Regions:
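Short runs within selected transmembrane alpha-helices of multi-pass transporters and secretion channels
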Residues: 79, 147-166, 174-182, 203-218, ...
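Small-residue-rich hydrophobic transmembrane alpha-helices
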Residues: 58-118, 155-174, 268, 281-339, ...
């Protein structure tokens, strides 16, 4: 199914940068967008094939988005730590470190996935209760979450495997495999819901099965490849030193990614208090607006990986050039995505739910959230730049204060006196602008390209 032909790695250390960044970033963005589309198919299918209960089914899936994002984003950040460690080792031409980091990453993913699956089953009900999920939505939301959590081992394994490939500059292999598993996901969604007349349990099972397929296919590629990232069954063990390096970079990055979900859990709780229509509208809009974030975040990932390899090779000036180009090219790509989404927003919302009230409320969210994407693009690229140097903790702390702190304060202090959907959504531009300013100040004060100029050894 997947050819084992040799794919030439993207040379991040030599030649022009501007034309290579899109070659790395756009497949990453396409992978994330396809992943969102396939995830959105859960909502689209239950919203169109579950009859009179469609609004409850859509709200049930949407009610879990913040919890699932919290878990997945945390470990995607840790996987990014693995990406940086491997990229830096490639830049240093340290084959032994690359091998140890790859095998350690695989074990981290499997063990973490099992742990999350077990712990998640125990706390699923209290979590949904804390989110104030309405009584008519709660049973379906709980069923969806519990089935989804069973798939955490394969979901996390795929994300770590994708990070391993991206550390070499290969962003196309994860894209191809995700496309295969994603098409399977859509077909299974339709089969379970439209044919077998299942509800949220059908789309949850389809998600688990398709993620299992993607993780198995990527693992097969890692076993068969002759590149530095080759996986040998006999070498699958955790190297403590490498584990420490991955966690030192990845855990703060994971916390930074999870901050979105933590803050959004608080926001989701406020949204839930406004009723089922607002819940359904917000859920549908989120699945559209995230496309713009996927575009800007792909350039942040490119920034991290390019800087990681060049820092390992001691090419500090090239690292600074990477940051500037990522901001410029990321801004152009993000602006194009925003315009396209706003022009087609109402039509896209109708795919999830054709209720006119849901579409109107959902479009309001699109306008307000997308207006803040410029701030997201700036702070994500600056954070990605610093992560490439292994400088991850302080940006994570600042992001926690800027996003999580501001949004929680907004919901606790401002929302009670302005209990409208717009009152909730204003938290997005406020928190993101504050965070962009704080991250810029960190970059100016710590200046990692100078701070690490003479310290380009092991991270």
């Amino acid at each position: 199914m997947i050819e084992n032909r040799k794919r030439k790695p993207l040379d991040m250390l030599h030649g022009s940068i501007w034309n290579k960044l899109p070659l790395f970033a756009l497949p990453v963005a396409a992978t994330a967008i396809l992943e969102q589309l396939f995830n959105a198919s859960d909502i689209a299918v239950v919203g169109n094939f579950t009859g009179a209960g469609k609004t409850i089914a859509v709200a049930a899936v949407g009610a879990n988005s913040s919890i699932i994002s919290l878990i997945v984003n945390l470990f995607v950040g840790i996987a990014l730590g693995a990406n940086v460690v491997i990229a830096n080792a490639i830049g240093r031409k340290d084959k032994d470190a690359v091998t140890k980091a790859v095998h350690t990453s695989i074990i981290i993913a499997i063990l973490a996935g099992i742990g999350v699956a077990i712990a998640g089953e125990l706390v699923a009900k209290p979590l949904l209760s804390a989110l104030q999920v309405p009584g008519d939505v709660f049973p379906e939301a709980l069923l969806y979450l519990r089935i989804y959590l069973i798939g955490m081992p394969v979901i996390l394994l795929y994300n770590f495997e994708a990070a391993i490939f991206r550390s070499t500059g290969d962003t196309k292999t994860p894209l191809v495999i995700l496309t295969i598993s994603g098409i399977l996901n859509v077909l299974l969604n339709l089969f379970f819901v439209a044919v077998l007349h299942m509800t949220v349990n059908g789309v949850a099972i389809a998600t688990v099965v398709s993620n299992a397929v993607s993780s198995i296919l990527l693992f097969y590629r890692l076993v068969k490849t002759k590149e530095l990232i080759h996986v040998d069954w006999k070498k699958l063990r955790i190297d403590r030193k490498i584990l420490g390096q991955i966690m030192r970079i990845g855990l703060p990055a994971g916390i930074q990614s999870a901050v979105f979900a933590v803050a959004n859990i608080v926001i989701q709780s406020a949204i839930n208090s406004l009723g089922t229509v607002v819940m359904a509208a917000s859920s549908a809009a989120y699945n559209i607006e995230i496309f713009a974030y996927d575009i800007l975040n792909s350039f942040s990932q490119a920034c991290t990986t390019f800087v990681g390899q060049n820092y390992g090779a001691g090419q500090i000036k090239r690292c600074r050039k990477v940051l500037i180009l990522c901001i410029v090219e990321g801004a152009i790509a993000t602006a194009c995505a925003i315009v396209l989404i706003l022009l087609t927003g109402k039509a896209l919302l109708s795919i999830f739910n054709n209720d006119s009230q849901v579409i109107s409320v959902g479009y309001t969210r699109l306008i307000m959230v997308l207006s803040a994407c410029t701030f997201s693009m700036l702070y994500e690229n600056m954070s990605g730049y610093m992560r490439g140097f292994g400088f991850s903790l302080i940006p994570a702390i600042v992001t926690t204060l800027g996003i999580c702190g501001v949004r929680i304060f907004w919901i606790m202090a401002v929302f009670p006196s302005h209990k409208t959907f717009a009152g909730i959504l204003t938290a997005y531009p406020v928190s993101l602008s504050v965070t962009a300013l704080l991250i810029f100040l960190v970059l100016v004060i710590y200046h990692p390209s100078k701070r690490f100029q003479t310290d380009k050894g092991e991270m």
